[in-house]
Amino acid sequence: MSQTPAVSRRLLLGSAAATGALATGIGSAAPVAAAEQAPRRRPGQKSMIGVPFAAHPTVRVAVIGLGNRGGGMITGWAAVPGCTVTAVCDIRADRAERAADRLESKGNPRPAEYGGSADSYARMLRRDDIDLVYIATPWEFHYEHGRAALLSGRHAVVELPVATELRQLWDLVDTSERTRRHLLLSENCNYGRNELAMLKAAHDGLFGDLTNGHGGYLHDLRELLFSDTYYTDSWRRLWHTRSTASFYPMHGLAPIAAAMDVNRGDRMTTLRATTTAPKGLADYRARFVPRDHPSWKETYINGDLVTCMIETAKGRTVRAEHDVSSPRPYSRINTLAGSRGIVEDYAGSAPTGARIYVEPDHGGHTWRDFETYRKEYDHWLWQKVGDDAANNGGHGGMDYVLQWRTVQLMRAGLVPDIDVYDSAAWCSPVPLSVTSLARGGRPVEIPDFTRGAWRERRPGLDSAPTDMPPAG
């Protein structure tokens, strides 16, 4: 498992073409067909929409990838009632040992350890005490590891993005359908307290008919990108040398898509991408990185701010932004608007960090704090496990809420909140932004990963209150 990004030829060619296309301006407004059309289902292959998990008395989790993200999530999995971590794996065997030590020191059973080679995860997947595989490796390995988990008969929770190519996204959909196992994007931001309250308010009609949303991942990662220890072998920085794309738009896009019932009555139809020049990383390097650092051999080609404008079948728009190269405070933007009002997150010093303006409650063109509405629309998950989340999870507790809910779904035998079709759709801007940028920002079609089932209204993150099953 090399730590060098295995960027495809398509991504590289797309980046090269983008340079020339952007110089000549945007072409025809007619959307360009996606490179891979919806493949036909094989005989016997069926949709996974509405398919519940088989009930599990205990959920046994194996973890692939024990760097910053995976290593930080293992204790959260172990803290969920009825969940145990049975095996851990990393190409660096010392990480597996440290992860096992950490779990054991907290009173958990010591998990089996795997590591030392690129195929260590395959050996781990031959165990018979795994129900769910959590994958937190570098982006370029997510598809390989997620697919292997499904083929081994396990469900998979995969960090962002689940894949970086359109054909890989389709293959994960098809593999999930053939194996009858679920693959879920580990989109913790969908379980944020503000995001879930926003979703409930939208579904209650507070904002009227929804018209547009704006989300992003705006996070100054420059210091971490140039760190010699944070991202193993600098894998994340190297993506900026090999492709021009919106690498990580899901944190901002997914909560907006969920509030708009994408794949549950609406769907994303077209995407057009724009990018700024790549300035931030080179400027940071010039000011703060010694001349003998390996990064001085690199040329950064990904724009600092990559913006995707997405249209839906119902005529809504979503703007999804990605910028990890600029000096700025953290923001996911998280803004949703409709015919009767708007909520805007990351917008001031109010306790919730969000502000709202809705008719007929407000007037005078004056924002109000979101706090009253968050209390009214507080999701049952936060009411039930919010205190535990504060003690066991990162990112304000939403990591643990995601973990708790995933385990609950599996133990109770319920339908997942986020399915493989959501996961594929929310991650599709990664490859589609490459295509759009390579064609001068022209719109490209977004595939319908549900193969027509998006018109069916069905529950998602707006779930009914449910108790965690008692211990067996």
Swiss-Prot record:
Pfam families: GFO_IDH_MocA (PF01408), Glyco_hydro_109_C (PF21252). Belongs to the Gfo/Idh/MocA family. Glycosyl hydrolase 109 subfamily. Predicted to be exported by the Tat system. The position of the signal peptide cleavage has not been experimentally proven. PROSITE patterns: TAT. GO terms for molecular function: hydrolase activity, acting on glycosyl bonds; nucleotide binding. Binds 1 NAD(+) per subunit. The NAD(+) cannot dissociate. This is Glycosyl hydrolase family 109 protein. Glycosidase. Has no alpha-N-acetylgalactosaminidase activity. Its EC number is 3.2.1.-. Substrate binds at residues 217, 236, 248-251, 330. Residues 1-35 form the signal peptide. Its cofactor is NAD(+). NAD(+) binds at residues 68-69, 90, 139-142, 145, 159-160, 188, 248. Keywords: Glycosidase, Hydrolase, NAD, Signal.
